[in-house]
Amino acid sequence: MKAEIKEFMDALKARTVGESEFHQAVQEVIETLWDTYQANPKYKANKILEKMVEPERVIMFRVPWIDDKGEVQINRGYRVQFNSAIGPYKGGLRFHPSVTLGGLKFLGFEQTFKNSLTTLPMGGGKGGSDFNTKGKSDNEIMRFCQSFMTELCKYIGADTDVPAGDIGVGGREIGFLFGQYKRIRNEFVGVLTGKNREFGGSRVRPEATGYGTVYFAQHMLAEKGEKIAGKTVAISGFGNVAWGAAQKLVQLGAKLVTISGPDGYIYDEKGLTQEGVDYMLELRASNNDVVAPYAEKFGAKFFPKAKPWEVKCDIAFPCAIQNELNEDDAKKLVANGCQMIVETSNMGCTAEAVNYANAHITFAPGKAANAGGVAVSGLEMSQNSMRYSWTAEEVDAKLSQIMKDIHDTCVKFGKEGNKINYVKGANIGGFIKVAEAMCAQGHC
């Protein structure tokens, strides 16, 4: 690490003690774009990078709600409004016991770059609560969402900050949140994305992140003169993202051999069929967080408490949680002939895994590869603004084009001789657009 980068990171860590995920995200970005930053006197003189790592606003609030026993419960709510240089703050709400301010700052920082790459006018933000939806009744979740939105509604709006769903926040929660916003503000506007189609949602939104990451992988392969059809693929997870990726992979003729859950992973040597992909929805609807029943139903092998990165594959898609793929996993994949790792979950790979993969095979960072979800959220915002609804085919075509544009940006800024450094390309491409906007608006 360069001395100047170390000095920058030491200063950041001193101001943000204990926020390790945020530090990891910032360091990965800075190491790839430091030379670009130093080469531009305008950025350096006005400390654009120093400003970029500080959120414009952090909102923290208590969320009191009443459980089914009539007892008062208290949770903590957050909204990190990170950067609005290129558009309204945009990013999901996460309801999970692991939610912390540092984790949300990491996600909001990443979101700023990801949204910039989509070419759509969206800034970066993230929010949520340490509330756990698991084990709660629909009425308890509704009362919590209503209390959460009663406070959050003071700080968001269709042209200010447009949250979406994330872990623990699906269509049910978005509906409760939107209903409360509408009651309080007495207006029907596109203040949230991920809504049901009946009240302003977009087609293709549930599968968008998964579809988008496969489109991105297609473009990566096309850059090498290859196609995705016939490739053996391993993915982790079985939620919305993994399901969307699985659906598109099967449609395009790839051989998908794994899905996984907290209980372990299944290996289907023949490859998942459309029936198997559809069964993923049943598994998720059961709320049991297990994939073992797939093995029983389809005659696949189940490996308890193991990760799918030990199987032979051409492409790996980590689709579950952050830091799920470590350096040892990356080494196993490379040793087994894996050609590409396409990071589909947010920061799905550890910093060590990214460095190892980038040095040995082709690696696509999440801020580029998983931008399909927020891209279709942006398209939902556009449809809400126009009071119009596009067909599934129209949305899918726009998503495919956006992922191509993101890939082209990564190639433009990440070309290193005969190789493309997608991490570098995504970071520089996302940074320059935001930095130029900040300078033009007098942020510097």
Which residues make up each language-model segment?
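N-terminal cap/recognition module
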Residues: 71-112
